[in-house]
A protein has these predicted regions:
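Residues forming the flavin
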Residues: 1-65, 128-269
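N-terminal/domain-start segments enriched in small and hydrophobic, helix-friendly residues
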Residues: 2-8, 27, 87, 104, ...
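Rossmann-like flavin
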Residues: 70-119
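Helix-loop-beta segment of a Rossmann-like dinucleotide-binding subdomain
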Residues: 73-77, 110-137, 208-212
């Protein structure tokens, strides 16, 4: 059995950035778990295209308008505003300053802003055509500099430890739900262990692999959504899955993605 203050399930950009923010308190013990043998292995690592920043002719209001328009009336206005206002500054603070990600620049040393579908401004930052790999490498290196962050590999989260979900007393079903960590499957030892935590963060990525055709890697199978549902979380809009529209359809090239940047710069079928 393991124990920590904060347990983060998933080591992609969401889990890694959460850990870096929380680790500012040196007394806080944080454990990140990943089912992969290598902490670099995540959906983030496979992203070829870029990430949204804030260009010189851009604003939070313009980005918010683009997000809501692309969402066709379904996106949460509150969540969209948080993303539009807080996302680009955090990109600079965490990815550039803390993780040292070297986004592409032009001959003058200024950021090279790219354009992608549904964006009214050039606001996409790239690292060549391997942006995700560069972000993953930078974040992993940053995590390793914190002595209060531990990364556990080859550990698959099976279920959340919740009260009263796992209680033997039937009357506990009337009590409020609380999460106390996760059951983890040790892929090397072939055994399930309890990992207790005061706070549990689900950062498990997507679910593309539940579909026959996808550009997602094998790990994107919806584990986090399933665990959250079993624990009593409300799952909404799960039917809205965005499929990457450009991929290489060739024998032996299953799920080989063609970057959205190709279309953003004017390519067409």
């Amino acid at each position: 059995m393991g124990q920590t203050e904060v347990l983060i399930i998933g080591c992609g950009i969401a889990g890694a950035t959460a850990a870096l923010r929380l680790a500012r308190n040196p007394e806080r013990r944080i454990t990140i778990i990943t089912r992969a043998p290598d902490p670099h292995e995540s959906n983030t690592n496979y992203a070829q295209g870029g990430i949204i920043g804030r260009g010189p002719d851009d604003s939070a209001e313009l980005l918010l308008a683009d997000i809501l328009a692309a969402g066709a009336g379904v996106s949460s206005p509150q969540a969209s505003r948080i993303l539009a206002e807080e996302g680009p500054p955090l990109l600079h603070e965490i990815l550039e300053e803390q993780a040292g990600v070297g986004f592409d620049r032009n001959e003058s040393g200024d950021m090279r802003w790219g354009h992608e579908a549904a964006h009214s401004r050039r606001r996409i930052l790239h690292v060549g055509d391997s942006t995700g790999r560069a972000i993953t490498a930078g974040l992993t290196a940053a995590l390793e500099r914190f002595p209060n962050i531990k990364i556990e590999t080859n550990a698959t989260a099976v279920d959340l430890i919740t009260f009263p979900h796992h209680s033997r007393n039937p009357l506990d079903n009337y009590q409020p739900i609380a999460c106390h960590g996760s059951y983890l499957f040790d892929r090397e030892g072939k055994a399930v262990h309890r990992y207790l935590a005061d706070i549990t963060v689900l950062a498990t990525g997507g679910l593309g692999r539940i579909y026959r055709n996808t550009t997602n890697p094998p790990g994107a199978r919806g584990d986090g959504l399933a665990m959250a549902h079993r624990a009593g979380a409300r799952i909404i809009n799960a039917e809205y899955v965005q499929f990457h529209p450009t991929a290489l359809a060739a024998p032996g090239a299953e799920g080989l993605l063609i970057s959205e940047a190709v279309r953003g710069e004017g390519a067409s079928c």
